[in-house]
Structures are given as structure tokens and as C-alpha cells.
């Protein structure tokens, strides 16, 4: 970056300790950190640190890969019914209103179109608070600090 050849970097799965170490040790502030982020895993501590350094959170698996019954969740369903929207659309709108980038996955054309159809409603403060209360404070998909998870992500088979 100092040579001017790189204008910005992004990182993935950098937890608070790793992110702060990168910033303080290398004087590099990433533009984005792609992390597991959905109503059940809101990464509040990490997002607070990211906000201090103006790092944009990018939510991979914004639908928690379908876990915890997210598409049938009573809170998300009730909020969606108020606006004529699906639970998935409520999640995407929550992310948008929280200034988080969402990268939802779908292979179904109808759902892809629905994912874009979130600009015609705004979640109320009460709606946002209800979603905030869904946070479990832990990952559902990846245990990023676990050594076997790190090896798996690098294609290395963990042997005991």
C-alpha cells in the first residue's frame, strides 16, 4: 500500500484480536471484514471495533445457512407479515438499515428477485430491537479460532 500499488484491502473472519493486531502492527486498515453475521450471530463487539476504524462489515451467510429455523422464525415472520415480506427480506433489510453489506446465496431466481426487493419498506425501531434480541452471541457455522477449523478452511485435514 505504501508503494501505491494497492488502494484497499479486505479481510475475512478477522476477530477483534486478529483485526487490531493487523491494524497496529502493519498500519493497514482494511476497508471490509467479511464475517459470519446474521440475527443469531450479530458480532456486536467486533462490529464496535470495526466502527472505530471505519471498517465495513460484510455479512456472509446472512440467512445462517438456514439454521435455527431462520425462515420460519416467529419474530422474523411476524415482522415480515407487517410489511408483506418474507423473513429473508426482513433479515436483508435489517442488515441494510444497520449499514452492513449482505451477500446472500440463492440459486432460485424467485428468491434472488426477492432478495433485491427490500427498498420499499423500513423496519421500525421496535422491529430492529426485536431482531437485536435474537442474538445468541456465538457462531452457528464456523468456530474461527479453533485450530481444526483453521486447518479445514485451508484444506488441511486435522489429524490427532
Identify the residue ranges that each predicted region occupies:
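Beta/alpha (TIM)-barrel catalytic core signal, keyed to glycine-rich beta->alpha loops juxtaposed to Asp/Glu
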Residues: 1-160
Amino acid at each position: 500500500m505504501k508503494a501505491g500499488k494497492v488502494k484497499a484491502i479486505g479481510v475475512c473472519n478477522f476477530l477483534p484480536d486478529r483485526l487490531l493486531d493487523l491494524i497496529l502492527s502493519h498500519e493497514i486498515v482494511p476497508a471490509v471484514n467479511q464475517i459470519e453475521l446474521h440475527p443469531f450471530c450479530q458480532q456486536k463487539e467486533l462490529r464496535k471495533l470495526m466502527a472505530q476504524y471505519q471498517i465495513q462489515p460484510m455479512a456472509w451467510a446472512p440467512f445462517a445457512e438456514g439454521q435455527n429455523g431462520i425462515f420460519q422464525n416467529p419474530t422474523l415472520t411476524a415482522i415480515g407479515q407487517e410489511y408483506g415480506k418474507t423473513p429473508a427480506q426482513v433479515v436483508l433489510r435489517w442488515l441494510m438499515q444497520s449499514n452492513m453489506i449482505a451477500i446472500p446465496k440463492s440459486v432460485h431466481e424467485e428468491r434472488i428477485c426477492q432478495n433485491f426487493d427490500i427498498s420499499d419498506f423500513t423496519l421500525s425501531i421496535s422491529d430492529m430491537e426485536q431482531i437485536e434480541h435474537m442474538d445468541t452471541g456465538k457462531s452457528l457455522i464456523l468456530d474461527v479460532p479453533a485450530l481444526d477449523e483453521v486447518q479445514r478452511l485451508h484444506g488441511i485435514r486435522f489429524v490427532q
